[in-house]
Each structure stands twice: as structure tokens, then as C-alpha cells.
Design a protein with these regions (language model features):
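Active-site-proximal, substrate-binding regions of enzyme catalytic domains
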Residues: 3-6, 10-124, 133-134
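Acidic, PIN/NYN-like endoribonuclease modules and their adjacent C-terminal/linker elements
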Residues: 120-125, 131-164
Length: 164
């Protein structure tokens, strides 16, 4: 999809292994890398941090390897504190406030980055597998919809970018 900037959530990156075949995966990572080089894939640093926290030390993590290899190309724009506050005032329930892990949830940062890039005139889509609303927490997909940012799962991203 020409001209679209993709802001990718850790849920989609973590699901690459389970949602793609061994045959398709190298093409997916190659396309992600070329999109990152073009400035069309963006990640907030909090997604990188979530990927690091979720890593299994005894198993190879291709998604984390890709994130770390492309970090300089993908983490070039960060939302400001004011931009994060604006997101949280609108969709604060994208975070489960009862969860006390001490670590920042990446979802508000994904949203703030997407809204910031939209404000710069870019055509932005969020890629996430987080689609299930809960009693005290809305999904990233729902929060993005409220904010007017289109959202697709990994399969939608792959289709739009012609990865098969």
C-alpha cells in the first residue's frame, strides 16, 4: 500500500512466528526491513522494551532480532509527554490501571506515535493483534478507532504490502 506508514504493536511482532509459515517469514522480515529503511515502519521505544521483556532466553526470537536490527530506522520519532497526556485523556482505559508491573505499557505510545504522524500529514495505520475489549480495558484496536486511526492485524498488513 503505497505511502502508508505502519506503526506496529508488539502483539503483532510477537505473533509473527505463530501466524506465518517458515516459507513466508523471511519475505516478511525482508519487506519489514525495506519499509523501515524507507521510513514507513515506525515503533515507539516502548514496543522495543516490551519485546525485550517478552523474550525467551533459551529460544531464538526472530522478531526481537529484527526489532533490534532496525531500531535506529524505526524509533526515529517519539511522542511527547503532552501528546501522551492527550491520548490518555481520550482513551486512558487502553491501559489496565490495576496492573502494577512497574513497566510502561506500549499501547498509549503506539497510539500517540500514530496520531503524531497523522498530524504530520502521513497516512498511518496501526498493526496490532489486540482486538478484545475487557471490562476495565479497551483494546488497542478500539482505542485507535476512537482516535480515528485505522488499525489492521498482521494478516491485513501482509495483504496490503503484498507479502505472501
Amino acid at each position: 500500500m503505497a505511502g502508508v506508514t505502519w506503526v506496529i504493536d508488539s502483539s503483532s511482532l510477537m505473533d509473527i512466528k505463530s501466524k506465518t509459515s517458515n516459507e513466508v517469514r523471511p519475505r516478511l522480515y525482508a519487506r519489514l526491513t525495506s519499509l523501515a529503511d524507507e521510513g514507513r515502519v515506525r515503533l515507539p521505544r516502548e514496543v522495543v522494551d516490551e519485546m525485550k521483556r517478552g523474550a525467551q532466553p533459551r529460544h531464538r526470537d526472530e522478531a526481537l532480532e529484527w526489532v533490534l536490527a532496525c531500531e535506529q530506522q524505526t524509533c526515529v520519532t517519539e511522542p511527547t509527554v503532552a501528546e501522551l497526556r492527550a491520548i490518555m485523556s481520550e482513551v486512558g482505559d487502553v491501559v489496565d490501571h490495576r496492573k502494577d508491573s512497574g513497566e510502561d505499557d506500549a499501547d498509549p505510545y503506539v497510539l500517540a506515535l500514530a496520531v503524531k504522524l497523522q498530524g504530520q500529514g502521513l497516512s498511518v495505520r496501526i498493526v496490532t493483534e489486540d482486538r478484545k475489549d475487557r471490562l476495565r480495558k479497551v483494546s488497542l484496536n478500539t482505542a485507535a478507532g476512537i482516535l480515528g486511526v485505522p488499525c489492521v492485524p498482521l494478516s491485513g498488513f501482509m495483504r496490503a504490502e503484498g507479502i505472501s
